[in-house]
């Protein structure tokens, strides 16, 4: 029997937690904003099919696809446990634009590893699997980080801890918030977005960053949505990355005037997120972004909620 796993889009950083905070989101209208991976019995050790809206952006050689690397490291871990790897056929349905700031690579990695693990009756536990996901993300971006793979896999808002054998833990957030996600249809490379950042920061920025992040986490745990939203500020990346995102400053200004609680860059961009309390405000902001922030037919805007589930089985057939 095959298995199909869907892994949702995620917001790295959530503005206030550079490299240590991430949130999984899914559209309220039921659209699948994420990748799906099917694993079923095959005749050779590994074969790969690709499908989906952004299939043309994938490498033609299966061995250059990150899901092949996922299979390689999964096989390595099974070998350590003395468990036999089943011959399998994998299909990656690529629905996420690459270089979008929506955790596109994390979607493929999480869906592939979760599906591989389920197909083999879950020989790896959650932490072991998450560690592999971080390793794969590091292969793409040059450094192991979990701020997309953790929320994508586990759901909700995740805080990266990486102590006592704990990779990340969920932060209670506000179910009533709408998250408007706007992808303009242009590409920003994570490497370029990293290079633009300063190598050192001023003391007052470090203090502000600590206050905002601590304040946000405190407000989430004590149930203060207004305070939490006020704390969603970024002094680490946004001031420098804004110039890579045409129209971002105007979009943030409009969203605030329309009643949005906070607006920021999703991951390294170019996608932005805008948090709204009321659905009509979210829809008004979404309409404006569709007309003014989206630059071509590849761009899109979705009104989302937090995805509390993370990756999930959607059946056995794509």
Curated annotation (Swiss-Prot):
Any GO BP annotation: threonine biosynthetic process
Keyword terms of this UniProt record: Amino-acid biosynthesis, ATP-binding, Cytoplasm, Kinase, Nucleotide-binding, Threonine biosynthesis, Transferase
Annotated binding of ATP, by residue: 97-107
Highest taxon listed in the record's lineage: Bacteria
GO MF terms, alphabetically ordered: ATP binding; homoserine kinase activity
InterPro entries linked: GHMP_kinase_C_dom, GHMP_kinase_C_sf, GHMP_kinase_N_dom, GHMP_knse_ATP-bd_CS, Homoserine_kinase, Ribosomal_Su5_D2-typ_SF, Ribsml_uS5_D2-typ_fold_subgr
Main location as per UniProt: cytoplasm
KW ATP-binding (keyword) present: yes
PANTHER family per UniProt: HOMOSERINE KINASE, HOMOSERINE/4-DIPHOSPHOCYTIDYL-2-C-METHYL-D-ERYTHRITOL KINASE
Functional description taken from the UniProt entry: Catalyzes the ATP-dependent phosphorylation of L-homoserine to L-homoserine phosphate.
Protein name, UniProt field: Homoserine kinase
Organism classification: Bacteria, Pseudomonadati, Pseudomonadota, Gammaproteobacteria, Vibrionales
């Amino acid at each position: 029997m095959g298995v199909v796993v869907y892994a949702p889009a995620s917001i790295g950083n959530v503005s206030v937690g550079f490299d240590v905070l991430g949130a999984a989101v899914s559209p309220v209208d039921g659209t699948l904003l994420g990748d799906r991976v099917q694993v079923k019995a095959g005749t050779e050790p590994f074969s790969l099919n690709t499908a989906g809206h952004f299939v043309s952006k994938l490498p033609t050689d299966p061995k250059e696809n990150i899901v092949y690397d996922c299979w390689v490291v999964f096989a390595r871990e099974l070998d350590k446990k003395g468990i036999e790897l089943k011959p399998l056929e994998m299909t990656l349905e690529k629905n996420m634009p690459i270089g979008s700031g929506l955790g596109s690579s994390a979607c493929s990695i999480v869906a592939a590893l979760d599906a591989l693990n389920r197909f083999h009756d879950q020989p790896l536990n959650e932490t072991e699997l998450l560690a592999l996901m971080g390793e794969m993300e590091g292969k793409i971006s040059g450094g192991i980080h979990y701020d997309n793979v953790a929320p994508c896999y586990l759901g909700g808002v995740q805080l990266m801890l990486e102590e006592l054998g704990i990779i990340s833990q969920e932060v209670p957030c506000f179910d009533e918030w709408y998250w408007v996600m706007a992808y303009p249809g242009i590409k920003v490379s994570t490497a370029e977005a990293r290079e633009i950042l300063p190598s050192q920061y001023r003391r007052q920025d470090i203090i502000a960053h600590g206050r905002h992040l601590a304040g946000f986490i405190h407000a989430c745990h004590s149930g203060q949505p207004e305070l939490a939203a006020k704390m969603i500020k970024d002094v680490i990346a946004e001031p420098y990355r804004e110039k890579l995102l045409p129209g971002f400053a105007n979009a943030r200004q409009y969203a605030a005037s329309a009643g949005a609680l906070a607006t920021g860059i999703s991951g390294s961009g170019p996608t932005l997120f805008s948090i709204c309390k009321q659905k009509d405000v979210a829809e008004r902001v979404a309409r404006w972004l569709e007309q003014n922030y989206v630059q071509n037919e590849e761009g899109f805007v979705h009104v989302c909620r937090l995805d509390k589930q993370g990756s999930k089985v959607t059946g056995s057939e794509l």
